[in-house]
Amino acid sequence: MAGTVLQVVESLGGWRLLDDGQPIFWFPERDSALETAKVMADARHQFDGKPTCVQAQDELGAFELVFAFG
């Protein structure tokens, strides 16, 4: 069963939320982007039962797993 990956990446002085690589939202603060991504990931997992995770860039630009559902 394929899952969904939401990613929070630095962009234009703020943070962009990517949905399977496609940009969907931009936030001025990282925490706002992470909270929105967490709610979206949890809702998707609740709705379709597929695994969903949130990854975010760290200070060096590498991705770290922040949340996982399913």
Regions flagged by a language model, labelled:
Residues 2, 29-42:
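Charged, amphipathic alpha-helical segments
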Residues 13-15, 36, 55:
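A generic structural signal for ordered secondary structure
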Residues 7, 44-46:
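Generic marker of residues within folded, mature protein domains
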Residues 20-32:
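A short, exposed loop/beta-hairpin motif centered on an aromatic-Gly-Thr core
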Residues 1-23:
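Short aromatic-glycine-(Arg/Gly/Cys) micro-motifs in beta-strand/loop hairpins
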Residues 46-70:
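Short, mixed-charge low-complexity intrinsically disordered segments
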